[in-house]
A protein has these predicted regions:
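Structural motif
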Residues: 10, 37-38, 112-113, 175-177
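Beta-strand-turn-beta hairpins that frame and shape the catalytic cleft
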Residues: 3-11, 106-116
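Short acidic low-complexity segments
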Residues: 31-35, 100-108
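Active-site-proximal loop/helix segment associated with metal-binding centers of metalloenzymes
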Residues: 115-177, 182
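Catalytic metal-binding/acid-base residues of hydrolase active sites
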Residues: 17-19, 46, 75-77, 106, ...
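N-terminal active-site segment of His-dependent metallophosphoesterases
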Residues: 1-71, 78-86, 143-147
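Glycine/small-residue-rich loop that forms an oxyanion/phosphate-binding "nest" at active or ligand-binding sites
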Residues: 83-102
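Conserved beta-strand segments of alpha/beta enzyme cores
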Residues: 9, 68, 98-100, 113
C-alpha cells in the first residue's frame, strides 16, 4: 500500500540585495526558476526604510509564483540608519498577503513550523575592536536611536538564540525549518 503524501518544496535564497540597481535589473530580466511551493529569503533583500521596497514588481511576481514568501531581515535591511528596535523584538511586516518579513516569529504552513529570526552573530570580546572598525553595520545601523555597537549586536544575538531554542522546544509540528541570516 502506498500513501499519497504531498511534500512541501522549499526554495531558498539569501543576499539578493534588491536595493542595488544592478541586482534589481538582473532579477527583472532573469527571474528565479520556480522550483518550490514556499520561497524563503534569509536576509539582505533590501532596506526596510526604503519606501519603494514593497512596491517592487518582483514581489508581485513572487506572490503569483509561490504559495508563501517568507523573509527574514538581515543586517542590510537596517542600513541607511534603520533602527533594529523600531519594530520591537518580534514582528512581521506584510508586503503582499502571501509575502511577509518575519523577525522572531513562527509561521506554520501545513504541519511545518518555520522559525524565522535574524540570529545576529556573536562577537567575541577579543574581536570587538576589529569588527567594530571593519563592519559597516556600526556606521549604518541604529539601535534605539543611537549607533549600533558590538554589545548591541551580542544582545540581539542572545535574544534571537533564546527565541529559536524556545520555539524549537515548544513546536508541535511534524517538521521544523529554522531560517536565519547569520550563523
Amino acid at each position: 500500500m502506498r500513501l499519497n503524501v504531498e511534500i512541501m518544496k522549499i526554495q531558498y535564497a539569501s543576499d539578493i540585495h534588491l536595493e542595488l540597481s544592478d541586482n534589481s535589473r538582473f532579477i527583472k530580466s532573469e527571474p528565479f526558476e520556480v522550483t518550490g511551493d514556499v520561497l524563503v529569503f534569509a536576509g539582505d533583500t533590501g532596506y526596510l526604510r526604503d519606501r519603494t521596497l514593497p512596491n517592487l514588481r518582483f514581489w508581485k511576481w513572487a506572490s503569483a509564483n509561490y504559495r508563501e514568501v517568507l523573509l527574514v531581515p538581515g543586517n542590510h535591511e537596517f542600513y541607511g540608519n534603520g533602527d533594529v528596535l523600531a519594530y520591537g523584538d518580534s514582528w512581521s511586516r506584510e508586503i503582499l498577503p502571501n509575502v511577509h518579513y518575519y523577525q522572531n516569529k513562527v509561521v506554520r504552513i501545513d504541519n511545518v513550523d518555520f522559525i524565522l529570526s535574524t540570529l545576529w552573530s556573536h562577537i567575541r570580546p577579543e574581536d570587538e575592536y576589529f569588527v567594530h572598525r571593519g563592519m559597516n553595520d556600526f556606521r549604518q545601523i541604529l539601535y534605539n536611536g543611537r549607533r549600533f555597537t558590538p554589545a548591541d549586536f551580542n544582545a540581539e544575538h542572545e535574544k534571537c538564540l533564546d527565541f529559536i531554542k524556545q520555539s524549537v522546544a515548544e513546536s508541535t509540528a511534524e517538521r521544523i525549518v529554522v531560517v536565519t541570516h547569520h550563523l
